[in-house]
From Swiss-Prot:
It comes from Mesorhizobium japonicum (strain LMG 29417 / CECT 9101 / MAFF 303099) (Mesorhizobium loti (strain MAFF 303099)). S-adenosyl-L-methionine binds at residues 81, 102, 130-131. Belongs to the class I-like SAM-binding methyltransferase superfamily. MenG/UbiE family. The gene is ubiE. This is Ubiquinone/menaquinone biosynthesis C-methyltransferase UbiE. Methyltransferase required for the conversion of demethylmenaquinol (DMKH2) to menaquinol (MKH2) and the conversion of 2-polyprenyl-6-methoxy-1,4-benzoquinol (DDMQH2) to 2-polyprenyl-3-methyl-6-methoxy-1,4-benzoquinol (DMQH2).
Length: 258
């Protein structure tokens, strides 16, 4: 779980994997990770989930159930490559408009290229900004989605408050994130795979294992399902619930602005 403390310089510190760093330093370090993996982001998620992330993302969009009518707007945060946004637009039969926000320009570049190739440029726009300081007016969006991104935010509580602010009354919050495995045997197997295999495979495939080591550590430091659900509730959301996937390797959290 991410816990903030005060640094010697007087600022707040937070978790960067298993390390303690200042909030500003974490953002810079995380940006560097995603600059390195932007062009191989799908491969990264395949390694982290043994390919299951594709099924989890499909399940996320199914639970969101975007309406098949014009004018419905979703904000997909930390969604630079467009993976979730494109699924949502497709599920709405081309009616939804998705704003993809990411703090990392390299990830957004990949997303813009993909949108153009898929013919979805008219249904999407890409914004480089911070999840803790969303550049949108109150009550702008019908839904807010974030997949495998919230654990990389230095101040998760601030990001959740911003999510609540930009949603319209009746709006939906959905967060897909790696979580705490709740099956004992699977827990040990996944831990061994994560800490031993993933960084080595990442280095072999991309030439740099450090980003993968951070991502594995960031999962271990993230709040478990119950604690994260409590954080969502504290941000103001109602009807908060979650669903586990693959024994808790991932969890999909839902909340409503009522």
């Amino acid at each position: 779980m991410s816990v903030e403390r005060t640094t010697a310089a007087g600022g707040m510190e937070t978790s960067y994997g298993f390390k303690r760093v200042g909030e500003g330093e974490k953002q810079s370090l995380v940006n560097d990770v995603f600059h390195k993996v932007a062009n191989r982001y799908d491969l990264m998620n395949d390694l982290m989930s043994a390919g299951l992330h594709r099924l989890w993302k499909d399940a996320m969009v199914t639970w969101l159930n975007p309406p098949k009518r014009p004018g419905w707007k979703v904000l997909d945060v930390a969604g630079g490559t467009g993976d979730i946004a494109f699924r949502i637009v497709d599920a709405s039969h081309g009616n939804a408009h998705a704003t993809v926000l990411d703090i990392n320009g390299s990830m957004l570049g990949v997303g813009r290229d993909r949108a153009q190739k898929k013919g979805l440029s008219g249904n999407t726009d890409f914004v480089e900004a911070n999840a803790e300081e969303l550049p949108f007016a109150d009550a702008t969006f019908d839904a807010y989605t974030i997949a495998f991104g919230i654990r990389n935010v230095p101040r998760i509580d601030v990001a959740l408050s911003e999510a609540f602010r930009v949603l319209k009354p009746g709006g939906r919050f959905l967060c897909l994130e790696f979580s705490e495995v709740e099956m004992p045997l699977l827990d040990k197997a996944y831990e061994a795979w994560s800490f031993n295999a993933i960084p080595k495979i990442g280095k072999m495939v991309t030439g740099d294992g450090e980003p993968y080591s951070y991502l594995v550590e960031s999962i271990a430091k993230f709040p478990n399902q119950q604690n994260f659900a409590a954080m969502i509730s504290r941000a103001g959301f109602d009807r908060v619930s979650f669903r586990n996937y693959s024994g808790g390797i991932a969890a999909l959290h839902s909340g409503w602005k009522l």
